[in-house]
Regions:
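C-terminal tail/sorting-segment detector
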Residues: 268-278
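Acidic surface patches and DE-rich sequence motifs
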Residues: 255, 264, 270-271
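Short acidic/histidine-rich active-site segments
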Residues: 192-201
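Hydrophobic alpha-helical bundle signature of multipass membrane enzymes
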Residues: 16-191, 204, 212-222, 228-232
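Residue-level detector of functionally pivotal "anchor" positions at catalytic/ligand-binding pockets or at interdomain
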Residues: 235-257
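Bacterial Sec-dependent N-terminal signal peptides
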Residues: 1-16
Length: 278
């Protein structure tokens, strides 16, 4: 158990550049161990589906392009490379120098949500697919992952979390962003790092962490900066401005005859509590 925690601590430190201060400490975040069910038992229909999906993943490796993508999705340490996997979907490359506000938001948010997996992983210590089948991984992660719990998937929790954050920054590209995030999570099945149920649980876990962030004032402030930076960098209209204009239009005052108060009206209006004909 100590070894497992030590391995996860190393991975967590690598993922958090320069010891980023998270929006919330881990003990302030929802406890997945109290929320998520146990992973499927070996004799359950859910685990039977895991076996089927493991076979599906191995079939996907026959597609060289998909396999190459799955291997690239395995990156963990370099967040700039991780973010690069969403470049086309997001419509913008994320980097510390090129998009400092977006980068700060993403790194700090992940420093907050990534550690959520640790307690549940250690508690269930689920055997990984490549371990159970004594298989090799095309992403060559065996030495790093062997002995570390499979449930939930850290990559999938992070990947779906990234998708949620990017879709909040650029909701007009949500379809592309979530499509990329879905495939990113499934890459963990393809390389044999995780069972499908690990991945599915992690999407839910990421959503839980994402919701928790919405109540943090520092996160809200940084999200607004990230949204403004995205609008500036891409030349797109800030959707918040569009919505504000729509609210302003819907809040206009009208005369009794139905004409806007800021336009000339004709007919009967109410003035000082009395009817008046214009």
């Amino acid at each position: 158990m100590i070894v497992v925690f030590a391995m996860m601590t190393v991975m967590n430190v690598k993922a958090q550049d320069n010891n980023v201060q998270p929006y919330y400490e881990l003990d302030q975040m929802p406890k997945l161990i109290e929320i998520m069910p146990a992973p499927p038992a070996f004799d359950s229909p859910e685990f039977a589906n895991d076996i089927v999906r493991y076979g599906w993943g191995k079939q996907q490796r026959e597609d060289e392009e998909r396999l190459e993508l799955a291997i690239a999705d395995a990156e963990w340490d370099d967040l700039t490379k991780v973010f690069l996997q969403w470049k086309d979907a997001f419509g913008l490359e994320i980097s510390e120098m090129g998009t400092p506000e977006i980068y700060k938001l993403m790194v700090t948010a992940l420093a907050t949500t990534d550690p959520m997996r640790k307690e549940t992983k250690a508690y269930y210590h689920r055997e990984r697919p490549f371990e159970r089948f004594n298989d090799t991984m095309p992403s060559h992660e065996e030495d790093d992952l062997r002995g570390e719990g499979s449930y939930p998937s850290g990559h999938s929790l992070r990947g779906w979390g990234i998708s949620l954050l990017l879709a909040q920054i650029a909701p007009q590209r949500a379809s592309e962003i979530f499509s990329r995030g879905w495939d990113y999570c499934n890459s963990r099945v393809i390389v044999g790092a995780h069972w499908q149920s690990d991945v599915d649980a992690s999407r839910t876990a990421a959503s839980i962490g994402f919701c928790a962030l919405q109540g943090n004032e520092a996160f809200i402030t940084q999200m607004k900066k990230a949204q403004a930076e995205y609008a500036e960098k891409t030349g797109t209209t800030d959707v918040r401005e569009v919505r504000a204009q729509a609210r302003q239009q819907s809040a206009r005052i009208f005369h009794i005859d139905g004409t806007p108060a800021d336009e000339n009206s004709h007919g009967v209006v109410i003035e000082n509590g009395k009817k008046k004909v214009q």
